[in-house]
């Protein structure tokens, strides 16, 4: 008896080979049996959840179990048409489709899809992805009075940084901003996207924004702080970048720190008769009212001598 391997073709192109067992007897007659593979095909189409634009680069796995722990086959990445197909032996009636990785800019779809297989047929599944967006947090800080040192007539005020409510900001698109489908333009460069005012904690948080570069411009400073004189001094840039497929929101943050208003007092001592400036006169600067720290504590009482100064030439 002689054993051989035999390759068969159906002639249809749907399945080119089978496998079987056969034997050859001395009479030269041959008997064999062939078991054809039961093949099934799965096709997945990937689209943007909002624009419905086809998305390339998404990778899916086909699993044997609903928990998607037992991977049967990893599909090729979706092509420019947003599709991927795979053919495999049908060993059970139902498999489960789940996304493994997504195109950059999108959040992973964690849903698993129940796929009913049919021998010799294609089962199609459509899956969408939501693009990742982000939020910008603006913080406002400035100097506040916290203490005083020295003796009466030679007092030095101490300041520290604190959070400020009431600062007003505009957020503009710093560039043309597109949806992550790379087709849909959502903002033109220079578009006003949102206006915000800081709250009691000194912060303001934007709505969900598309990923991209934004310009934050201070419009109004809180009471007791000085706003920048030029737009450049009042402007900061924030870029919302892709934070990965498992992150819900990208985060951007910027802090504006403003100076406190400062004053100077100049006194000129002159002769009553000839308008000549006089050297050596001593002046005192007194508190017109109680001077309090940011927490309300009185640091210098009304009528106290804050500083002495002697006139020069």
What are these regions (language model features)?
Residues 1-313:
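Solvent-exposed loop/turn and edge beta-strand elements of beta-rich ligand-binding domains
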